[in-house]
């Protein structure tokens, strides 16, 4: 089962965009195999233009995306989140994001990260200054609220799809039974006609 099988992706994109606009957090939805299924909302230059644009930075980012859950500090020092979207106990996708600071940054630590990733330090710090600062409590609450909302949408979409398919199977079953009954009736009429002919021949 895949998230996109039971949820309207355009609706998912609107929810994601509204979440990012309201909270200042970045967000994007991924399928169960990690592929992006929506466009990123509120992504920062710090992450996309600099960190992920370096070979080592991208390797570390992908590792975080694939291995981290809940809310966590990414390798570059920002706070991110990854919330699983579940259906009947099975993971069908996730929403990941964050790209915010829980407090004012220590510039020297980020300069060290820039050196490790072979990124221009001054440009990195300028991009860092544009990153939103949110309390850790607010980040946690926002991430899990989005997760709950998407899981509820997922359940509703699944139920709608399942019930629709169930009704279609019932209709198909009724049509099949009707066709079968018509065939039986037709065969019965043929048998009756044959029996009548045989009786007439027997009388002659």
Regions found by a protein language model. Name each.
Residues 1-77, 204:
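Structured interaction and signal-relay segments at domain junctions
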Residues 45-46, 60, 115, 172-179:
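Alpha-helix boundary/capping detector
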Residues 62-115, 130-153:
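Sensory/regulatory domains in signal-transduction proteins
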Residues 115-126:
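A short, charged helix-loop
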Residues 130-204:
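Signal-transducing coiled-coil/dimerization helices and immediately adjacent hinge/linker segments
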């Amino acid at each position: 089962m895949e998230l996109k099988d039971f949820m309207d992706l355009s609706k998912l994109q609107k929810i994601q965009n509204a979440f990012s606009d309201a909270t200042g957090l970045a967000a994007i939805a991924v399928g169960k195999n990690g592929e992006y299924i929506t466009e990123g909302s509120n992504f920062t230059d710090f992450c996309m233009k600099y960190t992920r644009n370096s070979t080592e930075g991208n390797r570390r980012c992908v590792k975080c995306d694939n291995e981290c859950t809940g809310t966590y500090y990414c390798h570059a020092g920002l706070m991110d989140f990854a919330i699983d979207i579940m259906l009947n106990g099975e993971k069908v996708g996730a929403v990941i994001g964050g790209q915010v600071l829980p407090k004012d940054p220590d510039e020297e630590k980020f300069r060290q990260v820039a050196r490790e990733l072979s990124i221009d330090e001054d440009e990195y710090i300028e991009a860092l200054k544009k990153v939103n600062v949110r309390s850790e409590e607010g980040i946690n609450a926002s991430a899990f609220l989005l997760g709950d909302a998407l899981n509820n949408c997922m359940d509703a979409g699944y139920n709608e799809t399942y019930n629709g398919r169930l009704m279609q199977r019932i209709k198909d079953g009724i049509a099949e039974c009707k066709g079968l009954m018509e065939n039986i009736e037709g065969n019965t009429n043929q048998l009756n006609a044959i029996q009548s002919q045989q009786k007439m021949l027997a009388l002659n």
